[in-house]
Regions:
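Short, small/acidic-rich helices and loops at N termini and domain boundaries
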Residues: 1-85, 268, 326, 350-359, ...
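Glycine-biased, small-residue-rich flexible motifs in mid-sequence functional cores and linkers
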Residues: 3, 72, 80-364
Length: 364
């Protein structure tokens, strides 16, 4: 019965996501919203006589019966804003949808979530970058989110499936259809290692106005949004702007300055709205993520052979400290900062130290 009230809350005329959350905060649950009297509802800020009447109208409850049957038949999970199953990263966003429909097996609470977006008219360059970038995470516990559209979205999902990486497609319509239709097989395959997610009930068409709203979910689910290839006037840049508004990291691959399909990425980088990256290692560095693949690629040479005594001394202190700033390191090594800077650069070049933001250093 709880599900019926949750669904009904999203069907009320005049009640959007913000007001729905406000109703839940005041009443305690979706069920209590509908058990409240008109007088009680009108005491809540933003609820006037008309909206209170809409909430208590019997047609609201009757309208969700068909949706409940669809959910049961297709084994769809309903993720409600006030419940622990709701994606934590998305819940932090002020305009997050109050309810989501999810079909699949992905863990939406995965610690490392990457959104990949880009143009529908991807070039071979964009496709190659996307596939290579995704493949770099095949040994990592990551979730890749995209929009199941033509072009970069599809390439990202396909590369994930090829490399056994969980991937979720966020839709701008109900789960009773797939748009574009050519991606039906891809969508079915994603249910085995990932899934499909939408805020829209069954029967919702892929109308144009739905996709900017869809983009906020793509941005909100992730720690970082990566723009692979995009024009200036594309949906990918909308997603990037939303991610920036959420104070999430945005990265972009640079492209040919004369190629229209790279103009959006270059613009994001030029205007400091995205970090320039050229590989998964660049992203891992930015996010301070450890990559399993990097550890396995370490050279099996002893430190005594590849490091001179001064380098070995600096390395040992960094390793013992876990991570350390250059000032503290200069104090512990009794070296000048200029001398230390040279040694640190040499250690970075040899792959035994990693530089972090804020002049911090750690071992791989």
């Amino acid at each position: 019965m709880k599900l019926v009230y949750q669904l009904a809350l999203t069907q009320i005329k005049g009640v959007g996501n913000t007001l729905a959350k406000q109703l839940i905060d005041h009443c305690g649950s979706a069920e209590e919203v509908f058990r409240s009297s008109k007088k009680q509802l009108m005491l809540i800020p933003g609820i006037g006589e008309r909206v209170a009447g809409n909430i208590l109208h019997k047609e609201v409850m009757n309208a969700v019966e068909k949706e409940v049957a669809f959910i049961d038949k297709h084994k769809i999970k309903v993720l409600f804003w006030s419940e622990p199953e709701y994606p934590v990263k998305l819940k932090q966003c002020i305009d997050a949808p109050v309810l989501l429909y999810f079909k699949g097996n992905a863990n939406l609470q995965t610690k490392k979530v990457i959104s990949i977006v880009g143009t529908r008219n991807a070039s071979e360059y964009g496709k190659s970058i996307c596939e290579e970038f995704v493949a770099s995470f095949r040994q990592e516990d990551v979730l890749v989110v995209s929009g199941l559209a033509h072009g970069i979205d599809s390439f990202a999902h396909e590369a994930c499936l090829k490399n056994q990486i969980a991937t979720v497609g966020v839709l701008g319509h109900g789960l009773d259809r797939i748009y574009p239709a050519i991606n039906r097989t891809l969508a079915t395959d994603m249910l085995k290692n990932g899934g499909l997610l939408t805020e829209y009930p069954s029967g919702t068409n892929p109308d144009r106005q739905n996709f900017p709203s869809r983009n906020r979910i793509i941005a909100g689910l992730a720690d970082v949004t990566v723009v692979v290839e995009a024009t200036i006037k594309g949906g990918a840049l909308i997603t990037a702007e939303i991610a920036n508004a959420y104070n999430r990291d945005v990265c972009a691959f640079p492209g040919d300055i004369k190629r229209q399909s790279s103009s959006g990425c270059n613009h994001l980088i030029k205007t400091h709205r995205a970090h320039l990256i050229s590989s998964a290692k660049d992203l891992a560095y930015l996010m301070n993520w450890d990559l399993t693949s990097e550890k396995k690629e370490e050279k099996q040479l002893s430190l005594e052979i590849i490091l001179n005594p001064e380098e070995k001394h600096v390395f040992d202190i960094v390793k013992e400290s876990g991570s350390i700033g250059i000032d503290a390191l200069a104090y512990k090594t009794n070296l000048t900062q200029s001398k230390l800077a040279i040694l640190l650069l040499e250690l970075e070049m040899k792959g035994v130290l990693i530089a972090l933001p804020g002049k911090m250093y750690r071992t791989p």
